[in-house]
Amino acid sequence: MSSRHRGRSLALMCLYQIDLVGTDPDRAMKFDWYDKKITREEKDYAVFLVKGVVENRKAIDTLIKKYSENWELSRISVVNRCILRLSILSLQKEPFLAAPVVINEAVELTKEFETEESAQFINGLLDAFYKKEILPKEPH
């Protein structure tokens, strides 16, 4: 498993705690709840993602609502919301990462923590977001 994938997994677990039980973000990002060894690179990447989502959550949630077609944010599972949040952040703030890689990572995380059906939903929403919000702004 790549360090970026582990970092995304850690970020997802942090965001889940923050969203579901209201854990303070700084407390969650200490990772003292995680019982496996974490490299500095994995932790730094997870912290980057969590801080980015926390700081931009309202704007990201507005985008999720826009592209989730007939789904209220509250109807989307906590795991799926968190995956969407960190993936939209990556698409917006990490232009050096290829969009298909970010979207594939989101799909893989969804398969790992949710269902195949959820993975299709995540893939469709992120693809639509990318094509309408990111792709038109990329240099051609």
From Swiss-Prot:
Source superkingdom: Bacteria
Gene Ontology biological process: DNA-templated transcription termination; transcription antitermination
Keywords per UniProt: RNA-binding, Transcription, Transcription antitermination, Transcription regulation
Recorded family membership: Belongs to the NusB family.
UniProt xrefs under HAMAP family: NusB
PANTHER family documented for this protein: ANTITERMINATION NUSB DOMAIN-CONTAINING PROTEIN, N UTILIZATION SUBSTANCE PROTEIN B-RELATED
Protein name: Transcription antitermination protein NusB
Designated gene of the protein: nusB
